[in-house]
Amino acid sequence: MKIQLLSDLHLEVQPDFLLRPAPDADLLVLAGDIGSYQYGSRLPGADFGLERFSPLRGWPVPVLYVPGNHEYDAVEFDATHARLRDTCERLGITWLERETVVMDKVRFVGTTLWSDFDALAQQARPAQQLKAREKAFRAANWYLRTTGTTRHGAPWLAEAVREQALVCQQWLREALAVPFDGTTVVVTHFAPSLHSADPRYGNVPGTAGFCNALDELLPLASLWLHGHLHCPSNYVHRGCRVVANPLGYAGKGEQQGFRERFCVAV
């Protein structure tokens, strides 16, 4: 099976960016941050940009989708979660948030994952771990306060994001523990390992908002696809190949490594 991987298209700022199906792909995986309605969004329509990938509207292969973080910008979290799922159902796109799907003897296990903000804390001495998490919280909240995401009537900040991440992690651990006689592919938006960290920034407190340290889960999959960081990844760690193919922002010079028709085989 050949999987075309796309993420971090940010169609809200580049709505005219055209993406074409890879001619040899059997499946398209969208690993989040496809389009949003953040302040100043230029995205037309109400389908988060997903309509252009609809198998019911001409996309030639099945499509799996895990939402990113930006889909929730400037909106209420739970209402938008339901709206995204309904949008996928209407467009014939397979929703993969905390879902497992088997296609041609390949198991796809997906979740946005979010961040527990402990990726760097795990490297610290026990007495310093909480301080490291608090630094990561502060770095994240500086940005999260600008997104406008709310949940239960309150701004959705780092502590609440961590709670959601722990829910996703628990689900993922349980899903991967289910025996499967075949190939397992994990799809997340947030990265599973600091090995995916953006080399432009290194391991700073903000990195814990992009990468988790779930390296112990890597041996449970043959392939792990993710997004979120605007730099490509393609490495093998603990027997698992980890791949990201984000578009990113043209204005930040992040698109040079993007490969529109990139496919990974399993």
What residue ranges belong to the model's regions?
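Active-site neighborhood of phospho(di)ester-bond hydrolases with catalytic His/Asp-centered motifs
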Residues: 5-7, 28-33, 63-69, 94-98, ...
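Beta-strand-turn-beta hairpins that frame and shape the catalytic cleft
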Residues: 1-4, 100-110, 236-241
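Binuclear metal-dependent phosphoesterase catalytic core
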Residues: 102, 198, 204-222, 229-266
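Active-site environment of divalent metal-dependent phosphoester hydrolases
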Residues: 10-16, 36-39, 70-80, 100-103, ...
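Glycine/small-residue-rich loop that forms an oxyanion/phosphate-binding "nest" at active or ligand-binding sites
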Residues: 75-96
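Short amphipathic alpha-helices and their capping/turn segments at secondary-structure boundaries
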Residues: 17-22, 53-57, 95-105, 125-132, ...
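Active-site-proximal loop/helix segment associated with metal-binding centers of metalloenzymes
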Residues: 109-185, 192-195, 200-201
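N-terminal active-site segment of His-dependent metallophosphoesterases
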Residues: 1-65, 72-79, 151, 158
